[in-house]
């Protein structure tokens, strides 16, 4: 965004958080120019998608836990731990399935639900359990270890848009995102 601000000083971005189930319609109506999210098989034919990066789910937990000795975390490794789930109300099917693959056998008392990734990380930092999040630009937490989940799928994360034909700023925004892809994970 900093580079975009320099190239387009009159551009006035509006950043919104919408459930992935809603942004396709907003893009169709041109109520917004672009949306970032996980690739969905239900993408409308009139919309385009450019992949920015591919990501697995990460397991984050207190660095003092025995899990920190492992490089890759399996579902078996999580048997004795509560799981902190990211649940913003309306959740991406990708995030939902990625988390529930590891949480489905837990008792309700072993599950914590958080509306933001920051809250999930805060609970993990306080020792309530482990959190499972897409490994995308996660805020650093000094006392948390981060490990890859075994057997987890790799998910495509990118930008959805209707057209950038008459919107050079949008084309440049997508190009800048792709150039900065290394910083997403």
Task: Give a label for each model feature.
Residues 146-185:
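A late-sequence structural motif
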Residues 46-57, 61-83, 168-171:
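Flexible hinge/capping segments at coil-to-helix
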Residues 19, 74, 115-116, 134:
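Short loop/turn segments at beta->alpha junctions
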Residues 48-58, 131-135, 142-157:
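Short beta-strand->loop
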Residues 1-9, 76-77, 93-108:
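Ligand-binding cleft/hinge of the Venus flytrap
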Residues 38, 81-104, 171, 184:
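Secondary-structure junction motif
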Residues 1-42, 113-114:
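Central regulatory/effector-binding core of bacterial HTH transcription factors
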Residues 24, 38-45, 95-96, 117-145:
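A ligand-binding cleft/hinge motif common to bilobed small-molecule-binding domains
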């Amino acid at each position: 965004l900093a580079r975009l601000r320099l190239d387009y000083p009159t551009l006035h971005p509006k950043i919104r958080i919408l459930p992935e189930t809603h942004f396709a319609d907003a893009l169709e109506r041109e109520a917004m120019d672009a949306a970032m999210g996980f690739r969905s098989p239900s993408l409308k034919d009139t919309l385009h998608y450019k992949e920015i990066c591919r990501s697995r789910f990460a397991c984050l937990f207190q660095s003092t836990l025995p899990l920190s000795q492992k490089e890759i975390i399996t579902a078996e490794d999580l048997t004795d731990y509560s799981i902190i789930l990211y649940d913003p109300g309306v959740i991406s099917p990708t995030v939902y399935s990625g988390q529930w693959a590891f949480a489905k056998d837990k008792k309700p008392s072993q599950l914590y639900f958080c509306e933001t990734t920051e809250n999930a990380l805060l609970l993990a930092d306080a020792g309530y359990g482990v959190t499972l999040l897409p490994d995308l630009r996660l805020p650093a937490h000094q006392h948390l270890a981060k490990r890859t989940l075994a057997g987890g799928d790799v998910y495509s994360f990118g930008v959805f848009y209707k057209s950038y034909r008459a919107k050079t700023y949008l084309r440049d925004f997508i190009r800048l995102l792709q150039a900065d892809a290394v910083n997403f994970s």
